[in-house]
């Protein structure tokens, strides 16, 4: 492993672990109105991130108009879209099933890097993608379906899969940015743009509901979501992914379903079987192979 990439790899691994914990937090927040839950999350995160920018005296980023539009698109698709679809899906399916479904993210991320960004994957890179996908298949086989094949359960799984597709786009859109942006500024912009996008819908939901009405555990889950995955996770991911190829970054998303499943099992007292541990081993092997890949130049044309 290249020593100069040690920090980017560690940052992306930690970021994906925090993203995996959103499965637990989102399941706890599922009782809240969707946009109200997101409003609480992004409001807390935005205040913390803006305070950090002020304390650290980070200069305002100078970006082209096209880059500002791209950032808004990232916030809409990968932040608001992912959160809304995940919260809706977790209201219909189990946390363990949702964790397993996120196993589609490594393959989607790497393939988008190939077909959208024009990057090339070596045979080792394709092998890493295959291992990551196989790990998630094993996790799904080991877990089985906890909700049967009814329409509600399948609908929840479909919503979670749609959220995963949003996340895959989100993780790669920043590769389209022409100017370098400080990771802390990137996290702050994503959070504040997301807050602005979901605020009108949250106000409508609060008005229709006659004011806030949810448990303290759901509110604390929203605060955790804001401080750890949204604030710390955004910063870690942008710190790491800005220094490696999109395909390499995509491999690290194999940690999302692994951490999601293990944290769901720990929090909700769900059993973890030997097949799950085997799946974890394959996911880790995929990361080892992925980090050994040398970045390839974009395809000509």
Q: Where are these predicted regions, by residue range?
A:
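Glycine-/small-residue-enriched transmembrane alpha-helix faces in small-molecule transporters
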Residues: 1-39, 147-176, 184, 197-198, ...
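Transmembrane alpha-helices of multi-pass small-molecule transport proteins
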Residues: 31-81, 108-109, 165-173, 187-206, ...
């Amino acid at each position: 492993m290249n020593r100069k990439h040690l920090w980017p790899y560690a940052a992306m691994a930690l970021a994906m672990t925090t993203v995996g914990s959103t499965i637990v937090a989102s399941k706890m927040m599922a009782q809240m109105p969707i946009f109200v839950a997101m409003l609480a999350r992004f409001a807390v995160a935005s205040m913390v991130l803006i305070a950090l920018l002020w304390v650290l005296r980070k200069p305002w980023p100078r970006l082209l108009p096209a880059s500002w539009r791209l950032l808004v698109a990232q916030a809409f698709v990968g932040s608001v879209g992912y959160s809304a679809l995940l919260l809706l899906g977790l209201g219909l399916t189990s946390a363990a099933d949702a964790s397993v479904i996120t196993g589609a993210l490594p393959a989607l991320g790497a393939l988008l890097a190939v077909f959208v960004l024009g990057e090339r994957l070596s045979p080792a890179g394709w092998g890493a993608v295959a291992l990551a996908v196989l790990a998630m298949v094993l996790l799904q086989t080991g877990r089985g379906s906890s909700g049967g094949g009814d329409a509600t359960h399948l609908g929840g799984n479909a919503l979670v899969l749609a959220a995963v597709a949003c996340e895959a786009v989100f993780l790669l859109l920043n590769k389209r940015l022409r100017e370098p942006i400080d990771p802390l500024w990137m996290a702050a912009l994503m959070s504040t743009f997301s807050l602005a996008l979901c605020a009108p819908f949250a106000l409508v939901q609060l008005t229709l509901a006659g004011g806030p009405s949810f448990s303290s555990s759901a509110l604390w889950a929203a605060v955790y979501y804001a401080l750890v995955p949204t604030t710390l996770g955004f910063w870690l991911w942008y710190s790491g992914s800005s220094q490696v190829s999109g395909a390499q970054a995509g491999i690290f998303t194999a940690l999302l379903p692994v951490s999601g499943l293990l944290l769901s099992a720990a929090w909700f007292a769900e059993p973890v079987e030997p097949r799950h541990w085997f799946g974890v081993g394959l996911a880790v092997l995929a990361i080892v192979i992925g980090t050994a890949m040398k970045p390839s130049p974009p395809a000509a044309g």
